Amino acid sequence: MLTLNTKLEKADQIDGELILPYDQREKSRLRATMVSGEDVAVFTVRGTILRDGDILRGDDGRIVKITAAKEPTYRVEALSPHQLLRCAFHLGNRHTQAQIGNGFLRIRKDAVLKEMLEGLGAKVEEELAAFEPESGAYGGGHHHHGDDGHHPLAPIPLRQKIHRPSDKAE
């Protein structure tokens, strides 16, 4: 089985394509099937989120492009920027992942959230689309110009460490 574990900034050729919904692109360990039918194992450092268009190199040197799968979502539009901002506020208040587009929000399909958004005056339509939510306040995703563009997948600190009583003081 092909193992994908190195992220590249660019590649001269693509040897395969792996189409994944968002919930699988945020997993650090994953077994999946490429478009060709070949099984692959994806190993990333915990906290890494694969984005549409990311390129991974396999243990045998092959290059695989990640494509965001179309999945059931809601497209949220409003009559004014203020109204859309209110919708974004209430979604964030519920810790709901949201994609921010030009004049719209996109969220995963959820009937309760749809009812809330419609109650705020938003137009909510079902849409089969790639879901690319914001990475959050602690998300990374930047790179430094001048690097060689080849690096093992590294963690993106999406969440702060939660200290539990059982954690030993250092």
UniProtKB/Swiss-Prot annotation:
Record keyword Disulfide bond present: no
A family per Pfam: UreE_C
Record keywords: Chaperone, Cytoplasm, Nickel, Nickel insertion
Cited InterPro entries: UreE, UreE_C_dom, UreE_N, UreE_N_sf
Region (Disordered) residue spans: 134-170
Record's GO cellular component terms: cytoplasm
GO molecular function, one term: unfolded protein binding
Cross-referenced SUPFAM superfamilies: Urease metallochaperone UreE, C-terminal domain, Urease metallochaperone UreE, N-terminal domain
CDD domains attached to this UniProt entry: UreE (cd00571)
Subcellular location(s) per record: Cytoplasm
Major localisation: cytoplasm
GO biological process, one term: protein-containing complex assembly
Cited function: Involved in urease metallocenter assembly. Binds nickel. Probably functions as a nickel donor during metallocenter assembly.
Family: Belongs to the UreE family.
Name of the protein this chain belongs to: Urease accessory protein UreE
Gene this protein is translated from: ureE
